[in-house]
């Protein structure tokens, strides 16, 4: 029963090793391990072939030849797998997720309320392309808003004031690269889509 599990790993290009005497009492299992930030191995996914529970519960099926057969049960992690994956990613990136993974990809920072219509217009274009954003409409100083976005590890901050609205541009700051200067909405969108589609860190 180990051979099919190893074939699955091989087809998925997963480097494997046989853990002698590590199988569960009910049958062989496949554990997907990863190294955390401390270099320690943790299990992220488990798939197990259970050869005991079907008998214990009296489970049977009728095979194509009409005979009764005892099924094997496949255990797998489901919800725990997602939780462990999220924990791994949060730990690895320390909350500074790459753009493609960040829950909030863009933070718009209008300098004053009168710039909100322009920001909303640009935000609608980005939203149509699948970009996730928020607009910081708080009555706070711009420097404070930028600092907050940096502390929250938002990948991009978009600042819009009179000059940007008049020239149909945006002032762009990147968490990773700092001040990127002025861009049109089309230029910004091209950059974002390239970074997301290529899964850039």
Feature-to-residue mapping (PLM):
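Generic long, charged, amphipathic alpha-helical segments
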Residues: 93-145
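Short beta-alpha junctions and helix-cap segments that line functional grooves
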Residues: 18-20, 29, 45, 144-148, ...
């Amino acid at each position: 029963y180990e051979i099919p599990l190893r074939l699955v790993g091989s087809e998925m290009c997963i480097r494997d090793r046989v853990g002698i005497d590590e199988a569960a009492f009910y049958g062989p299992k496949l554990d997907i391990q990863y190294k955390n930030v401390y270099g320690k191995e943790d299990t992220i996914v488990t798939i197990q072939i259970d050869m005991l529970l079907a008998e214990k519960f009296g489970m049977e099926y009728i095979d194509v030849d009409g005979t009764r057969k005892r099924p094997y049960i496949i255990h797998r992690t489901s919800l725990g797998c997602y939780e462990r994956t999220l924990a791994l990613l949060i730990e690895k990136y320390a909350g500074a997720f790459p753009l493609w993974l960040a829950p909030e990809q863009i933070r718009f920072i209008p300098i004053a309320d009168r710039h909100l219509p322009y920001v909303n217009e640009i935000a609608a274009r980005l939203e149509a392309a699948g970009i996730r954003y928020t607009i910081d409409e708080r009555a706070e100083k711009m420097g404070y808003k930028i600092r907050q976005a940096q502390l929250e590890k938002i990948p991009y901050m978009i600042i819009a004031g009179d000059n940007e609205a008049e020239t149909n541009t945006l002032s762009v700051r990147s968490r990773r690269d700092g001040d990127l200067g002025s861009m049109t909405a089309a230029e910004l969108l091209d950059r974002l889509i390239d970074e997301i589609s290529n899964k850039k860190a």
